[in-house]
């Protein structure tokens, strides 16, 4: 993980929002570690909203509407699912402190979810933080094929419609790169972030 990181003795929701506004975000070493540290990558993952790409096969799946998509319906369930250990994700950086902080941000109107439902079953989702005209994606999970991908498609559509200018993915992965995610040097990211923070806080 290239970039700076520093431990924090204590974080409040207001401090957390301030950190996002200057390019920091929190992580924990593991779910069982109560400590949190700040991360500021040298290369920041950004998914340009005007260059979002989906494959033909995924576009076809989206048109079939295999899941009901809901927004901000089950925040606690989404963040709990994102924190679960799976075969592809044997450890998690989401500890109880982070879960509590983001639940408070949800109550404040700054944390949001996109959820895929199959009947009464939550089968995929993602959560993140909105501030100014920026959305900071935190984590996602999937229990059915393409569920989290479809949530991402709906997230981008919603952000575009609401006038958001920045979708921050923190880091890039090969998975996110297929959607158009790029690595942005810290100095260039700071300019994108500053512009997004000058905007009034947009309603998600």
UniProtKB/Swiss-Prot annotation:
Location(s) in or outside the cell: Cytoplasm
Enzyme Commission code(s) on record: 2.3.2.6
Keywords carried by this UniProt record: Acyltransferase, Cytoplasm, Transferase
InterPro entries on file: Acyl_CoA_acyltransferase, Leu/Phe-tRNA_Trfase, Leu/Phe-tRNA_Trfase_C
Record carries keyword Cytoplasm: yes
Cellular component GO terms held in the UniProt record: cytoplasm
Alphabetized GO MF terms: leucyl-tRNA--protein transferase activity
Reactions it catalyzes: N-terminal L-lysyl-[protein] + L-leucyl-tRNA(Leu) = N-terminal L-leucyl-L-lysyl-[protein] + tRNA(Leu) + H(+); N-terminal L-arginyl-[protein] + L-leucyl-tRNA(Leu) = N-terminal L-leucyl-L-arginyl-[protein] + tRNA(Leu) + H(+); L-phenylalanyl-tRNA(Phe) + an N-terminal L-alpha-aminoacyl-[protein] = an N-terminal L-phenylalanyl-L-alpha-aminoacyl-[protein] + tRNA(Phe)
Coiled coil spans: none
Major site of localization recorded for this protein: cytoplasm
Family affiliation: Belongs to the L/F-transferase family.
NCBIfam families from the UniProt entry: aat
Function: Functions in the N-end rule pathway of protein degradation where it conjugates Leu, Phe and, less efficiently, Met from aminoacyl-tRNAs to the N-termini of proteins containing an N-terminal arginine or lysine.
Protein name listed in UniProt: Leucyl/phenylalanyl-tRNA--protein transferase
Source species of the chain: Rhizobium etli (strain CIAT 652)
Lineage: Bacteria, Pseudomonadati, Pseudomonadota, Alphaproteobacteria, Hyphomicrobiales
């Amino acid at each position: 993980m290239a970039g700076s990181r520093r431990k924090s003795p204590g974080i409040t929701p207001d401090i957390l929002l301030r950190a996002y506004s200057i390019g920091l975000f929190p992580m924990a070493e593991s779910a069982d570690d109560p400590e949190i540290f700040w991360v500021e990558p040298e290369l920041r993952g950004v998914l340009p909203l005007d260059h979002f790409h989906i494959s033909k096969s995924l576009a076809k799946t989206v048109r079939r509407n295999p899941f009901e998509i809901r927004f901000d319906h089950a925040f606690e369930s989404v963040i709990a699912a994102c924190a679960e250990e799976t075969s592809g994700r044997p450890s998690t950086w989401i500890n109880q402190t982070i879960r509590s902080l983001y639940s408070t941000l949800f109550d404040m109107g700054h944390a949001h979810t996109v959820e895929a439902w199959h009947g009464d079953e939550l089968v995929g989702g993602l959560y993140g933080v909105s501030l100014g005209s920026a959305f900071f994606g935190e984590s996602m999970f999937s229990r059915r094929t393409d569920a989290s991908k479809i949530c991402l498609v709906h997230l981008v559509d919603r952000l575009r419609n609401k006038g958001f200018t920045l979708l921050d993915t923190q880091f890039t992965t090969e998975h996110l790169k297929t959607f158009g995610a790029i690595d942005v040097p810290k100095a260039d990211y700071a300019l994108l972030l500053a512009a997004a923070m000058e905007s009034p806080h947009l309603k998600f």
